Amino acid sequence: MRIALGGFRIESCTFSPLLTREQDFQVLRGSPLLASYPFRSQYGDVEFVPLVEAAALPGGPVEKSFYERCKGEFLQGLQEQGPWDGVFLRMHGAVNVAGMDDAEGDLLAAIREAVGPAALIAASYDLHGNVSQRVMDCIDVLSAYRTAPHVDGAETIERACSLLVRCIREKIRPHKVFIPVPILLPGEKTSTEWEPAASLYRLIPGLIKGDAVLDASILIGYVWADEPRSTASVIALGTARDQVHHAAVTLAQRFWNVRHEFQFGVTAAPVDRCIHEALDAPERPVVISDSGDNPTAGGAGDVPYVLERMQALGVTDGVFASITDPEAAAICETAGPGAEVDLLLGGKLDPVHGKPLRVQGRVRSLCQQPWLLHRTGDAGVVNHMAVVDVQGIQVIITERRTPFHRLADFRNLGIEPRQHKIVVVKIGYLEPELKALAAKALLALSPGAVNQDITSLPFKRIQRPLVPFDPDMAWSPVAIGCGRKPQESRNARS
């Protein structure tokens, strides 16, 4: 059995002025790509062949020429190294390529044409992916994350790949049911850490029944993409048509029934109110999410508005993580630790939502670290970072857009976040280590490309009616047929 490996992963915010270019991606080929599948050893009779996978931190639309090169390289590998029993892709599901809708559909259609109708195609998806009919017509297995924050990424990849191997071995071509659900909400309201998403996702394991229902997925969708396909969806697959249909309709209807119950899991408020509440709180640290400029949702990561308000409201014991500004990082590195610097900080990557903020402070520390997306891949790219003490606020400046999700991200720069009164992080819902850190958590409704006030965003191309834009709309689940004809196994039951 031979399975080709690859993928193209990024969450693309169409409201961002940034263009995501080749230098923003990490590209894996050959042995590094193969090594990123540690579970492959359990499939001794399977030859996994690494082709090419590109992945990037969420950002703006992808430069089309880079996407086309990656796609061309993958297709060339398929043609030159075939034949294939299967293709496995690590995907996100919310790629936007400049000038193109539904990049995943474009890629999967090309792969299907290259490998022909007999080979099976499978993919793992982020639950914030937007799934199109074209994707479902081309693919055989799609399995999505079941947690947000995403603590089951590796588990989902292994599950989807295992399903592919199983279907090839047992000669199963699954029946698929796809139900777009007209709901489009931000991840900060749909985290599986709280209700109603927690209960909704707990339904999935009980609906999976051997070959009859092999898998089921709920995709919340990605809200900051102004595309016709942007909506939530439910997918189920298996060999028993009626049971697959029942599983999908059950999940879709339950999702719809709780559509008005989704809400922020922590106090969400305007920036000034969050800062005042943090200053007044007896506990420490208070972690504030700078949600509108969250780089892990597609924000630029250089809007300095919250930092400006921290200064204006008299914060003198805090951490600001972080602001992306290569010029400012270089100035700090040239000046050196202990030097006084005068900086125009931020507002350069995203001048739409912020303008440069003048700050004066002392360089506290410098750091050069390998820039590793999700801490994997080629460590040949260095990220220059600096910490500047601005009147008691430890401002982290990075050369590259960088998430701060773990305590080690702070400690590597000489910052112990537990020692500070206020810790501001450009993030939405808190990742596990930050959640554990926070004596109190607040979500600031800050400006940026991923603004939480989604009904105010300039959508022009989403399909209406759609909740929350049309809160009183009526709907009931309608299963959509998919282009690939199912092939039931010998043990299938209807």
Where are the predicted features?
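Glycine-rich phosphate/diphosphate-binding loops that line cofactor/substrate pockets in enzymes
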Residues: M1, Y43, Q76-D85, C274-V286
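Active-site histidine-anchored catalytic micro-motif
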Residues: A4, F8-E11, K64-K71, Q81-I172, ...
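Short acidic, glycine/serine/threonine-rich loops at helix termini
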Residues: F15-L19, V62, G99-D101, S132-D137, ...
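Low-complexity, highly charged intrinsically disordered N-terminal segments
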Residues: V46-V49, E53-P58, V62-G77
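Cap/lid and interdomain-hinge subdomains that line or gate substrate/regulatory clefts
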Residues: F48, P58, A122, G129-V223, ...
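N-terminal amphipathic/basic leader segments beginning at the initiator methionine
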Residues: M1-Y43, V52
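Hard-cation-handling environments
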Residues: E188-Q391, I396-R400
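Extended hydrophobic packing segments that form well-structured cores
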Residues: P50, G72, W256, P370-R493
